[in-house]
Amino acid sequence: LYLNKLGWKKSVRFYCITIGVFAILFIPFLSYEFFENYSSTIGLWFSKFEFNASVYYFLKWVQALTNGLSLINSMGIIVVCVVTLQTIYLVVKRKKETSQLLLMILWVLSGYYFISTTVHPWYIISLLLLSVFTNYKFVLVWSYTLILSYLAYNEFSVKESSSVLILEYTPVILMLAWELYSKKSLKIKAS
């Protein structure tokens, strides 16, 4: 994400130093069991858990109508591919201003959370912080509507309601669409 801001040479240096520092700090935790358990956890995260997932639930519903196969088993790789392509697109498109970097991080994280299989309410905190430095308010709406996800918890289990998810995500998507459309309209009028 820092490529346009720092340039190729400084970016490579920055990432090498960052990875090197984390690798050194990580040495005390190195063990075969750690890697085995960590990879198992990541595998579970992307291929077993489902909670408060907007786009994923919609795709799952469409897939159930068409062929009935389980989408969750392939969702991990789909999320990685989509977020990687989105990041590459934004890196190429972005200007070299710091405000643009924060906006790009906001778009990458938002895209990830929109297609993720699991979105707990506290995940949006980073988006909320980033949105303070942009003109976009859809994250603020999302932070208000996310409280509805707690309706899925009852005394013994977690059971999500489609109507609650629709009620939760419709205002967010409408606000995002309105903001994107109005900002595009402003750019067209300014030209």
What is the predicted function of each stretch?
Residues 136-191:
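Aromatic-enriched
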Residues 116-127, 156-162:
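Membrane-interface catalytic loops of GT-C/OST-like multi-pass glycosylation enzymes that act
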Residues 21-28, 108-116, 143-156:
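Aromatic-anchored segments of alpha-helical transmembrane domains
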